[in-house]
Amino acid sequence: MALLIIILSMFYLGLMGILLNRLHFLSILLCLELLLISLFIGIATWNTSNSIPQNTTFNLLLLTLSACEASIGLSLMVALSRTHSSDLVASLSLLQY
């Protein structure tokens, strides 16, 4: 029960970090990583508490996807800092018409 509270608080902190910290792109990426880590820990503990050893491949897939997400996010941050010379989210105008 205590682990569930820790996992939910990690997820909540990551979500609040994304909603409240919209100034820098790196802080948004870190909050996304916190969301993924809390999701991974939650799924891993659920699998072990229910004695489901077959879902370890799902855990590895989730870790692989989070590593890909981190590398793509960091490459976007490098491209952003090279073109706009900062990592401010306000300097992004790619989605505006």
UniProtKB/Swiss-Prot annotation:
Keyword check for DNA damage: no
Keywords carried by this UniProt record: Electron transport, Membrane, Mitochondrion, NAD, Respiratory chain, Translocase, Transmembrane, Transmembrane helix, Transport, Ubiquinone
Classification via Gene3D superfamilies: 1.10.287.3510
Subcellular location, record wording: Mitochondrion membrane
Membrane topology type: Multi-pass membrane protein
EC number: 7.1.1.2
An example Gene Ontology CC term for this record: mitochondrial membrane
Keyword Cytoplasm: no
Example of a GO biological process term: ATP synthesis coupled electron transport
InterPro entries documented for this protein: NADH_UbQ_OxRdtase_chain4L/K (IPR001133), NUOK/Mnh_C1-like (IPR039428)
Main location, first listed in the record: mitochondrion
GO MF annotation list: NADH dehydrogenase (ubiquinone) activity
Function: Core subunit of the mitochondrial membrane respiratory chain NADH dehydrogenase (Complex I) that is believed to belong to the minimal assembly required for catalysis. Complex I functions in the transfer of electrons from NADH to the respiratory chain. The immediate electron acceptor for the enzyme is believed to be ubiquinone.
Protein name (Swiss-Prot/TrEMBL): NADH-ubiquinone oxidoreductase chain 4L
Gene that specifies this protein: ND4L
